[in-house]
């Protein structure tokens, strides 16, 4: 909006010169342009490069090497800003830009120690509704984001955007992409009109190129008070088509879709996700969990959440296309591989889990409780316990490590089985044989379990 305001100011001065010659050395009038632009947007404006203008047959203006602001992190720069206006509306006093081309914009957006946005303090002196843009093209932009409270920063490079703007107050829409941390993230954006109370209805879709994921945020962005807030919904999805493509690229035989969605409140310090729902697998056969989550931003971001469910059916969720299902031991290993591979986050995560009943191997696991957290090598399990077939109570803690397609667990475990033969038959996916003398089994030790090893130490 700042750069658009600058061009409005300069085009006003240009139209005022319509009675002059058609070919003018506009560079000699540089100080006039800068003074008028500075007056209209309330901050210092400099145009250090060439100025090219054409009045007929189509009014157009091209500026090179633009600087806006009084210095510091809030200064805005651009290598080129070009305008082309529709002649008919211009003669009627309407500013309808048929095309605006912006090359190399660079700006910094940050939060000070109190969480307020640091940006140029503009005081625009024209009506924003007087400008509409049919085609807005931005290329090779750079945006530097920073937070003074904790020193965190991020850089968006190679930003491009193509869209249309009905007014500087909205609505507007378009698509583009930005490179963040070496990864390309295409996006689509649509916004309503900026209201008097400082709110903007906004919908953003992000489809990262290097991650099998689709992100959608839809809600109201409040900009009043220099502390932005977002209140709406967030959806993180790996839909069927992305799951299939991911499986092909990774060599997997099966790759299930999943979705995490819910209400979200975002401030400059945190994001609180309320009443969210996690689904894994298809709509008719997948499992569903609900919960709440709190994501704290900053130099050391972390994610804390709680997942709960009354009853989930892993037999249906993990069944193959022909309906066959893996035995419980293989299913547990597969779930561990999925947790370490598909859900390997880039930030620390801690999640509490509580599920009343899980159907697996045609039988039930009851009262599954525990905490999981992440580290560089996988997941940590803390105070996990559940009841399994064979009148079995299982308690374990330890580390679930994932390397490539392999998974291993190391940690202390305690098993109390009233019918160990029934427990073994269930784990192997076979029918229980006729029972003779059944004796309970109590087992404690440090367990190591992997694709090619099972060992118990200090038994």
Residue ranges and their predicted role:
Residues 310-346, 351:
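Intrinsic disorder/low-complexity detector
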Residues 281-296, 364, 372-374, 380, ...:
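Extended intrinsically disordered, low-complexity coil regions enriched in Ser, Thr, Gly, Ala
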Residues 201, 271-275, 307, 352, ...:
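Short, structured motif recognition centered on aromatic/hydrophobic residues
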Residues 52-115, 124-146, 172, 294-317, ...:
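Flexible beta-edge/linker motif
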Residues 246, 328-335, 339-343, 360-368, ...:
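Intrinsic, low-complexity N-terminal interaction/targeting segments
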Residues 80, 97, 105, 121-228, ...:
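Elongated, acidic membrane-bridging lipid-handling scaffolds
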Residues 1-42:
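N-terminal type II signal-anchor transmembrane helix
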Residues 261-271, 299-300, 344, 360-365, ...:
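Short, low-complexity cationic-aromatic patches
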């Amino acid at each position: 909006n700042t750069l658009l305001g600058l061009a409005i100011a300069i085009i006003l001065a240009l139209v005022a010169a319509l009675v002059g010659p058609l070919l003018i050395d506009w560079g000699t009038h540089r100080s006039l342009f800068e003074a008028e632009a500075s007056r209209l947007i309330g901050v210092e404006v400099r145009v250090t490069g060439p100025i090219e203008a054409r009045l007929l047959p189509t009014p157009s203006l091209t500026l090179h090497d633009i600087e806006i602001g009084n210095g510091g992190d809030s200064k805005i720069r651009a290598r080129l800003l070009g305008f082309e206006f529709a002649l008919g509306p211009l003669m009627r006093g309407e500013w309808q830009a048929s095309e605006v081309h912006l090359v190399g914009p660079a700006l910094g957006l940050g939060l000070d120690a109190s969480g307020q946005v640091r940006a140029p303090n503009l005081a625009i002196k024209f009506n924003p509704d007087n400008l509409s843009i049919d085609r807005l093209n931005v290329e090779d932009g750079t945006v530097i984001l920073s937070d003074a409270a904790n020193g965190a920063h991020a850089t968006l490079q190679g930003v491009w955007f193509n869209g249309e703007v009905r007014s500087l107050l909205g609505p507007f829409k378009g698509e583009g992409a930005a490179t963040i941390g070496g990864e390309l993230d295409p996006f689509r954006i649509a916004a309503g009109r900026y209201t008097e109370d400082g709110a903007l209805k906004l919908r953003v879709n992000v489809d990262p190129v290097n991650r099998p994921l689709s992100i959608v945020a839809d809600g109201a962005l409040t900009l009043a008070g220099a502390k932005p807030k977002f209140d709406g919904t967030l959806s993180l999805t790996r839909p069927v088509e992305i799951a299939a493509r991911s499986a092909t690229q990774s060599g997997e035989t099966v790759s299930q879709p999943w979705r995490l969605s819910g209400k979200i409140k975002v401030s400059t310090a945190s994001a609180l996700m309320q009443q969210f729902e996690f689904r894994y697998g298809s709509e008719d056969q997948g499992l569903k969990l609900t919960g709440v989550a709190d994501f704290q931003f900053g130099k050391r971001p972390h994610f804390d959440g709680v997942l709960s469910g009354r009853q989930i059916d892993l037999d249906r969720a993990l069944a193959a296309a022909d309906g066959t299902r893996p035995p419980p031991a293989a299913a547990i290993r597969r779930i561990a591989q999925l947790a370490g591979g598909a859900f390997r986050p880039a930030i620390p995560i801690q999640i509490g889990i509580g599920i009343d009943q899980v159907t697996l191997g045609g039988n039930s696991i009851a009262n599954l409780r525990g905490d999981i957290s992440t580290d560089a090598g996988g997941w940590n399990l803390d105070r996990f316990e559940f009841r399994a077939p064979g009148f079995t109570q299982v308690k374990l803690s330890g580390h679930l490590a994932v390397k490539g397609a392999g998974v291993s667990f190391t940690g202390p475990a305690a098993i109390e089985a009233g019918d160990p033969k029934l427990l073994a038959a269930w784990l192997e996916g076979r029918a229980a044989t006729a029972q003779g003398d059944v004796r309970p089994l109590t087992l404690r030790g440090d367990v190591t379990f992997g694709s090619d090893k099972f060992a118990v130490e200090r038994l």
